Amino acid sequence: MPEDFFSSAFYTDTLINNIESHRKDGKPFFAYAAYTAPHWPLQAPKAFLDKYQGVYDQGYGEIAQQRLTRMQEMAIVDEHAAVQSTPDFYPKWDKLTPSQQAREARLMEVYAAMVDALDYNIGR
């Protein structure tokens, strides 16, 4: 498998090639794209990973609050809305060690990169 292989790009390339090869035959064409991202394994092309590097270093609680504030400023949600608390089974950010925080931030970066890459490929 090529070093830069990413399933969403491969599926999209294959679908585009099939559409192009059937474009002129005048027959109906059905396509079903069943992407596997953003499920395990968590991986994404480097360009997408680079885009999210450091974005989640503040932790999930702080990011949730920033997103809520931005939505309130845009009048998307009520000004009295509050960030939902983290479920008890999930550790609070400030209770994690620095290495655990770094790992969680990295997982969120990769997940965001996968969703972004998937969205890009669907748009092609």
Question: What is the meaning of each model-derived region?
Answer:
Residues 1-124:
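Active-site-proximal cap/lid insertion segments
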